[in-house]
């Protein structure tokens, strides 16, 4: 059975999920016992689960579907691009028309001093790359010791090694010897949470 088009009953999907899918920030045994919520479809700002319950997606698919679901015009453009050139990297002095066109448009829309665009597959990857790029920049400038990054306590920047280090969330730091060296955290801008009157 093709699970992408022919949906099994919720309990069977939950059993397969528990057997094979690792969820982030989750106690897997507890989730396996109760079963994950299975999202079946989405439209606009709403999600529908495999039992037919509809939810407002206030997290925009975890912050990456801020234009809403089911946008036909975007699906059409994406399908056209997938047929022409679904993906290609820009390593090894190579580029492609979508990267050129989007970079030019973003530079046009951005303030005058922001004219160069670097693409990444996720926010976490972008943050990790920025840590490396900033440190490399200062090393090339002859200041390799200028490598301290200041971030906020309780900030979430992603779950990769560098991004979790930037995020000042102690439970994440305890999962793997984080933060990486020279990332320091200052208080979050929350007067009451920090003990203010």
Short names for language-model regions:
Residues 2-43, 93, 98:
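Active-site-adjacent loop/helix segments that line or gate small-molecule/cofactor pockets in enzymes
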Residues 23, 84, 191-192:
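Active-site/binding-pocket entry motifs
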Residues 10, 54-143:
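Glycine-rich loop-to-alpha-helix module at the N-terminal edge of alpha/beta enzyme cores
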Residues 20, 81, 159:
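Phosphate/oxyanion-binding loops and surfaces in catalytic or ligand/nucleic-acid-binding neighborhoods
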Residues 104-197:
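PLP-dependent aspartate aminotransferase-fold enzymes
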Residues 16, 21-22, 63, 87, ...:
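Tryptophan-centric aromatic hotspots in well-structured domains and transmembrane helices
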Residues 48, 68, 163-167:
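Short beta-strand-to-turn element immediately C-terminal to the catalytic PLP-Schiff-base lysine
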Residues 36-57:
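Active-site and channel-lining beta-strand-loop segments
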């Amino acid at each position: 059975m093709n699970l992408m088009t022919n949906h099994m009953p919720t309990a069977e999907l939950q059993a397969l999920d528990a057997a094979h899918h690792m969820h982030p920030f989750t106690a897997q045994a507890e989730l396996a016992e109760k079963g994950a919520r299975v999202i079946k479809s989405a439209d606009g700002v709403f999600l529908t689960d495999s039992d037919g319950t509809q939810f407002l997606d206030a997290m925009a698919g975890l912050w990456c579907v801020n234009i809403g679901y089911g946008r036909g015009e975007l699906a059409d453009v994406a399908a056209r691009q997938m047929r022409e050139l679904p993906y290609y990297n820009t390593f090894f002095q190579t580029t492609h028309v979508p990267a050129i066109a989007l970079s030019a448009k973003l530079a046009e829309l951005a303030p005058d001093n922001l004219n160069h665009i670097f693409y990444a597959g996720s926010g976490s990857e972008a943050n990790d790359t920025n840590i490396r790029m900033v440190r490399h920049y200062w090393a090339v400038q002859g200041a390799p010791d200028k490598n301290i990054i200041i971030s906020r306590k309780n900030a979430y920047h992603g779950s990769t090694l560098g991004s979790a280090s930037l995020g000042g969330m102690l439970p994440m730091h305890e999962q793997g010897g984080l933060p990486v060296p020279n990332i320091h955290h200052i208080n979050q801008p929350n007067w009451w949470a920090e003990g203010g009157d």
